């Protein structure tokens, strides 16, 4: 299990995913109000002029999408760091046990 975590960690470190979202993720909220004509046609004429443009600007100004993408990248890396630390601690304990066995054998001679 720890070897798998180390391999995943190395792959993530070598193939860094950009911190900014992919442009297609940015296009979805912007195009959403324009692609639903039923919601636009049900509004009053004054709302139709300001409705889609206002919702488009609000969705673009919202940092929610950027935060969600960054968190989804940070959480696995944080978990992998914890797994890496646990693997290092286990390896250090195993090495200490091996060293103790070697010293015990040398001391018996």
Curated annotation (Swiss-Prot):
Propeptide residues are: 23-67
Is Phosphoprotein given among the entry's keywords?
A: no
- Cellular component terms (Gene Ontology): extracellular space
Q: Which residues form the signal peptide?
A: 1-22
Q: Taxonomically, which superkingdom? A: Eukaryota
Which residue ranges have biased composition labelled Polar residues? 51-60
User: What job does this protein perform?
Assistant: Suppresses food intake, delays gastric emptying and decreases heat-induced edema. Might represent an endogenous ligand for maintaining homeostasis after stress.
Q: What is this protein called?
A: Urocortin-2
Q: What is the lineage of its organism?
A: Eukaryota, Metazoa, Chordata, Craniata, Vertebrata
């Amino acid at each position: 299990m720890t070897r798998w975590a180390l391999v995943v960690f190395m792959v993530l470190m070598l193939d860094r995913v950009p911190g900014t979202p992919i442009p297609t993720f940015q296009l979805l909220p912007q195009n959403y109000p324009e692609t639903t004509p039923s919601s636009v046609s049900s509004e009053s004429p004054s709302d139709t002029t300001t409705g889609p443009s206002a919702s488009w600007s609000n969705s673009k100004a919202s940092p929610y999408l950027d935060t969600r993408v960054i968190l989804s990248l940070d959480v696995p890396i944080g978990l992998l760091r914890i797994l890496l630390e646990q693997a290092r601690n286990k390896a250090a304990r195993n090495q200490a046990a091996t060293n103790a066995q070697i010293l015990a054998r040398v001391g018996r001679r």
